[in-house]
A protein has these predicted regions:
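Hydrophobic helical membrane-anchoring modules
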Residues: 2-38, 188, 211-295
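Acidic helix N-cap motif at the loop->helix transition within catalytic regions
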Residues: 53-57, 82-91
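Short, acidic, metal-binding catalytic loop of nucleotide-sugar glycosyltransferases
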Residues: 61-70
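Short beta-strand/loop segment that forms part of the nucleotide-sugar
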Residues: 70-80, 101-102
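A conserved acidic beta->alpha catalytic loop
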Residues: 77-86, 132
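Acceptor/aglycone-binding surface of glycosyltransferases and processive sugar-polymer synthases
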Residues: 97, 101-119, 124, 133-215, ...
Length: 295
């Protein structure tokens, strides 16, 4: 059977991030062992790059949102050069649900999410921006929708819709422009594709094509695979530390090529219904052929 080159590349990147010889890297292994000993209902992936000051408050909020649950938090440090690594290392000593992966070189937010996804143990995957602007207390509302839909056999991603966004006027304007482009060219009807908080089944997430900046187009990609996207109103708040990593002009220029690539993907989506395996009739249900009478 042919292997998936993209999957191989992602796995190599994870090995590199785990090969960092530091106290934090050693604890990644022990945390992974703990996570594998107990069933994990949901894995929360938090990609970060230079988010010192936001680390511990957000971890504590995630733990509160999933109190008395089997969960894991996977932080993916995308080669931060501030105190992010130190803050994550300190948190490992007191938060047993925490795991930390570290990229040896900067790879971007989508690559960080992918690294966490490949290491996650939960059947459900939650994604959360590491800047603290999304509120972890909104996770249960998203999770309940996904669980209810899965009982009906549907593949669903529950995605946040930010209420009263606490961003600059320029960033809000850029966001509205991006929303118009996605709606016009990708038929993306989700009101807030850029919102960082979402939950979906791990099996569905793994089916989505991986490329740089794919996290911005997840509603379109989920629908491409026959999934349903449900929007949930969520809170939004200002940062308590650090600055945004995105520049509006850079985002616009990169976004144009991304949209063209996603259009290419959507037009080539395979058309196929459900697949069912045909099983042999059990021996007990087979009709025995009558014996011929003796001559």
């Amino acid at each position: 059977m042919a292997s998936n080159p993209a999957s191989k590349t992602s796995k190599r990147n994870v090995v590199k991030s785990g090969a960092v010889k530091s106290r934090a890297a050693q604890k990644v292994g022990s945390a992974s062992v703990r996570a594998n000993r107990n069933p994990v209902e949901i894995s929360i992936l938090v990609p970060v790059m230079n988010e010192a000051g936001n680390i511990r408050p957000l971890i504590d909020e995630i733990c509160s949102a999933f109190a008395n649950r089997q969960f894991e938090i996977i932080y993916i440090d995308d080669a931060s050069n501030d105190a992010t690594a130190n803050e994550l290392t300190a948190a490992l000593d007191t938060v047993p649900q925490l795991r930390v992966l570290r990229h040896t070189q900067r790879a971007g937010q989508s690559a960080a999410i992918r690294s966490g996804l490949l290491q996650a143990n939960g059947d459900l995957i939650g994604v959360l921006d590491g800047d603290g602007q999304n509120v972890p207390a909104d996770f249960p509302a998203l999770e309940s929708l996904v669980i209810a839909a899965s009982k009906d056999g549907k593949m669903v991603m529950a995605a946040g819709i930010r209420q009263r966004r606490d961003d600059s006027a320029m960033r809000l304007l850029a966001s509205r422009g991006a929303k118009w482009v996605r709606a016009s060219l990708l038929a993306d009807t989700h009101p807030d594709s850029g919102c960082g908080i979402k939950i979906l089944p791990r099996t569905l997430f793994l089916q989505l094509p991986f490329f740089n900046h794919m996290h911005r187009f997840m509603p379109s990609l989920v629908r491409r695979h026959g999934g349903v996207v449900l929007g949930v109103p969520v809170a939004h708040r200002p940062r308590i530390a650090g600055t945004s990593k995105y520049r509006i002009l850079d985002r616009l220029l990169v976004g144009i090529s991304d949209v063209l690539g996603v259009i290419w993907l959507l037009r080539r989506a395979p058309t196929q219904g459900a697949v069912h395996e045909v099983l042999a009739t059990p021996p007990a249900n087979k009709k025995t052929k009558p014996k011929e009478a003796a001559q």
